Each structure stands twice: as structure tokens, then as C-alpha cells.
């Protein structure tokens, strides 16, 4: 008898549901893409978007760190207090993986540990 893939409560790699890992419908941006979005010139564009009626809140309330749109300013401010947002800030503290770091890991240079970046929650602008 063949053993089937177990899908349990604990989060070890053996027990994860493989089909859920490959689904791309609700896939969020990777951390290096969010670091790119956090640069001042890109952040300004994302936080001051034109009105888009297809997105929640007409694309006016956007969390830069989680890459999510919210319905209104109150919901966005509540999101800043959640565990999900705080976890994402903690993940973003480590600087993104670069080609130079990959070359050092392959033996072409000495290892330099990744630096920690100070990441703070974005400012919310009150719209009147």
C-alpha cells in the first residue's frame, strides 16, 4: 500500500500541501520586490496612485510593506497594528539577497553577514 501525502496541522516541510504551494492566484510580492518598492521614488508612485475603480478603496489606501490595498483609511490604520504587518516588517529588516552575496557564498570573496535595515511603518496621509 502506498502512503499518501499527509496534510497536518504543524508547518514542517514534509507535511505541507504541495498543491497550495504552487498556486499563484493569491501570491504576494517577494521581499526583494518590496524592498525595491520601498525606495523613495517608487514609494511615492505607489502611495499616490490615480483612482482605479477595480481595486479596493479605489487604490487610495495601500500598505507598502504588505503590498495590499484597503477599503478605507481606518482599515489601513488597523492593519498597521496587526500581527501580519508586524511580521512583515520583521522580515523586511534583513537586506535583500544580491548577486555579490551569491558570489561570496560560492567562494569568490569573503563572507559578509547581511545587514539589518531599520524599517518603520509608513506615514498615513489624512485626505479631506
UniProtKB/Swiss-Prot annotation:
The keyword Plastid does not apply. Keywords: Cytoplasm, Metal-binding, Nucleus, Ribosome biogenesis, Zinc, Zinc-finger. The keyword Zinc-finger applies. It comes from the Eukaryota. Residues 1-21 are annotated as: Disordered. Signal peptide: none annotated. It is found in: Nucleus, Nucleolus; Cytoplasm. Involved in pre-60S ribosomal particles maturation by promoting the nuclear export of the 60S ribosome. Negatively modulates the DNA binding activity of Oct-2 and therefore its transcriptional regulatory activity. This is Zinc finger protein 593.
Amino acid at each position: 500500500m502506498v502512503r499518501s501525502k499527509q496534510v497536518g496541522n504543524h508547518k514542517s516541510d514534509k507535511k505541507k500541501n504541495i498543491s497550495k504551494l504552487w498556486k499563484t492566484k493569491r501570491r504576494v510580492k517577494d521581499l526583494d520586490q518590496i524592498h525595491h518598492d520601498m525606495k523613495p521614488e517608487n514609494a511615492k508612485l505607489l502611495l499616490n496612485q490615480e483612482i482605479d475603480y477595480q481595486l479596493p478603496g479605489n487604490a487610495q489606501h495601500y500598505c507598502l510593506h504588505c503590498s495590499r490595498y484597503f477599503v478605507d483609511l481606518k482599515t489601513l490604520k488597523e492593519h498597521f497594528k496587526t500581527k501580519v504587518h508586524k511580521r512583515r516588517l520583521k522580515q523586511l529588516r534583513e537586506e535583500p539577497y544580491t548577486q555579490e552575496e551569491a558570489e561570496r557564498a560560492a567562494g569568490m570573496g569573503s563572507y559578509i553577514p547581511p545587514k539589518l535595515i531599520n524599517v518603520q511603518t509608513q506615514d498615513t496621509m489624512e485626505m479631506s
